[in-house]
Regions:
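Residue-level detector of alpha-helix initiation sites
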Residues: 132-134, 157, 227, 231
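Glycine-rich dinucleotide-binding loop and its adjacent helix/turn
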Residues: 82, 96-122, 246-276, 318-418, ...
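N-terminal basic/disordered segments at the start of proteins
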Residues: 1-13
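N-terminal Rossmann-like FAD-binding beta1-loop-alpha1 element of flavoenzymes
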Residues: 126-150
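N-terminal Rossmann-like dinucleotide/flavin-binding domain of flavoprotein oxidoreductases
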Residues: 10-70, 89-101, 163-215, 429-466, ...
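Rossmann-like dinucleotide-binding cores of NAD(P)H-dependent redox enzymes
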Residues: 148-188, 243-278, 302, 396-454
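Non-heme iron-sulfur electron-transfer modules
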Residues: 16-37, 64-83, 113-117, 155-181, ...
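Glycine-/small-residue-rich beta->alpha transition segments that form the dinucleotide
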Residues: 205, 230-242, 309-310, 314-322, ...
């Protein structure tokens, strides 16, 4: 044991001698290194299997002890350091802390992982912020271990982005088949309290004991009474873009996000509800139609206070605003889509029943203006361009790689070729980030299926005589290229979900 100016080394040595399996304790003081030969003899005479060097700078003595242990044929990995300085054995409770540091080293337990003497009791409940697949899986694992979980989700259902997907990569498994049983388990688990349409507004306390204030927005529908009969939505006169369908279809002001939603009950979009916005002067058709009388348009928000010991932030992601990247024509050319829009287009539960078609122009009878929509009777594209890294790895937008874009773009290529065998598919990529198990094999499979893979930056998407032209570079062949396509899918960069930074503070 090394000398320390701020601690009673004799007392620590006496304490150490009484620890389990401790054979001998020596105080080295400030003297020079002991000889390795002498230490070797002491190790052999005491049959030592582990040596703990304790003090402010125990690493100073480690080389000679390592040499001595090697001379005996012992395990040099069993030379353990118990650093008082590194682990903060100073000031109040310094002696207790120093003893704990020595005890941990003696028992082979890292001090950073051990309980600190005098710590407060830990609340075993966990708050999980975010009800996507990460939050769902975390909630189930903790709840199945017998611990209370509070799962907070700001939308009207759990499921997150994964609920929007058709297939997963690289196995091409059904996304809903994986996700929906987990969603049901969360909704029925006795150890999970699910709070949808909720946001965390304040967190106080310290690790192991947090007090959390949650604001739950009014749903206006009693989830225990609602039977999801859809009669309320049938009479609702308001139509707005569906968030779940990434805006490519419409929903009502009273709606259920998707058929497998949990809770499986309707909710009211107060921003677009005529009754709420007019303060009760207009509409109210849903209230009159509901056979269960479970709609209350006068419901107000409420505040919920909980106490937990752990907080998991699983708030997920959003897509970068791709309209800022003007060279790709998003919002200008009707058949330029984001990755999430294409996910919903190709999904069997989507607006076209999974048929991949180009948009159709029609007259909006209400506004008397022409608009572009996806129709199940639409025309399939003859050629599709998939552009990687839209907004990713770009100093103007996101300097980082979003990690998933390469693989889901390859998945899109497979789905397109599967549903439209004679279509021409072009993958424009910068670097193929196939980093996971089976990813490289999946990339090779897509190439073998006939997808044209072009490496290089994509410069622009333009329109010429009602035909989209994708211009870019082909690095492998040292040339500039142009391809005529009917549809463009943008692999848009990911950004943290809104409010994540605020939560972290």
């Amino acid at each position: 044991m090394e000398d320390s100016r701020n601690l009673n080394i004799d007392a620590i040595a006496k304490y150490s001698a009484n620890l389990p399996d401790v054979e001998t304790v020596q105080i080295l003081g400030l003297r020079p290194h002991p000889e390795a030969k002498t230490l070797c003899e002491q190790i052999q005479s005491n049959n030592l299997e582990r040596i703990v060097i304790a003090g402010d700078m125990p690493g100073y003595f480690k080389p000679v002890f390592t040499k001595a242990m090697a001379m005996t044929g012992g395990n040099t990995n069993e030379i353990r350091l118990a650093s008082f300085q590194e682990h903060g054995a100073r000031g109040e409770n310094a002696m207790d802390r120093a003893k704990a540091i020595v005890a941990c080293a003696s028992m082979g337990v890292p001090f950073a992982l051990a309980a600190i003497p005098g710590g407060n009791p830990v609340n075993h409940a966990t708050l999980i912020i975010g009800g996507g697949i990460a939050g769902i899986q975390s909630a189930l694992e903790i709840a199945n271990a017998g611990k209370q979980v509070y799962l907070v989700e700001q939308t009207g259902t759990i499921g997150g982005h994964m609920a929007m997907f058709d297939k997963t990569f690289p196995t091409l498994d059904c996304a809903a088949c994986i996700l929906t049983p987990k969603m049901v388990s969360v909704g029925q688990h006795e150890m999970i309290r699910l709070l949808t349409r909720s946001k965390v507004v304040a967190v106080t306390g310290k690790p192991g004991s947090y007090r959390v204030k949650i604001r739950q927005s009014a749903r206006y529908v009693d989830i225990n009474a609602c039977v999801a009969c859809n009669q309320c939505a049938e009479v609702c006169p308001v139509k707005v873009e569906s968030e779940f369908d990434a805006g490519i279809s419409l929903r009502k002001a009273i709606y259920i996000p998707f058929p497998q939603a949990v809770p499986n009950a309707y909710l009211v979009d107060e921003t677009n509800c005529l009754y709420i916005q007019s303060e009760g002067k207009k509409c109210g058709a849903c209230v009159k139609k509901c056979p269960k009388e479970c709609i209350d348009l006068s419901e107000t928000d409420r505040t919920i206070d909980i106490e937990v010991g752990n907080i998991i932030i699983a708030t997920g992601y959003e897509l970068l605003d791709v309209s800022k990247i003007e060279q790709y024509g998003y919002g200008v050319y009707p058949n330029v889509l984001t990755s999430l829009e294409f996910e919903r287009l190709t999904n069997a539960s989507g607006t076209t029943g999974g048929r991949i078609v180009t948009k159709t122009k029609r007259l909006n009878k209400k506004t008397q203006e022409e608009e572009w929509i996806f129709s199940p009777e639409g025309i399939p594209p003859r050629s599709v361009a998939l552009i990687h890294c839209v907004g990713s790895r770009n100093k103007k937008y996101n300097p980082y790689c979003s990690r998933v874009c390469c693989m889901y773009s390859l998945k899109f290529a497979h789905l397109i070729k599967e549903k439209i065998p004679n279509v021409a598919v072009y993958e424009f990529y910068i670097d193929m980030r196939a980093f996971g198990k089976g990813y490289e094999e999946f990339a090779e499979r897509i190439k073998q299926e006939g997808t044209f893979v072009v490496r290089g930056h994509t410069a622009s998407v333009a329109m010429n005589n009602e035909q989209m032209i994708v211009r870019g570079e082909d690095i492998f062949n040292d040339r500039l290229v142009e391809f005529k396509v009917d549809m463009v899918v943008l692999a848009v960069g990911l950004i943290p979900a809104p409010g994540t930074e605020e939560i972290s503070r």
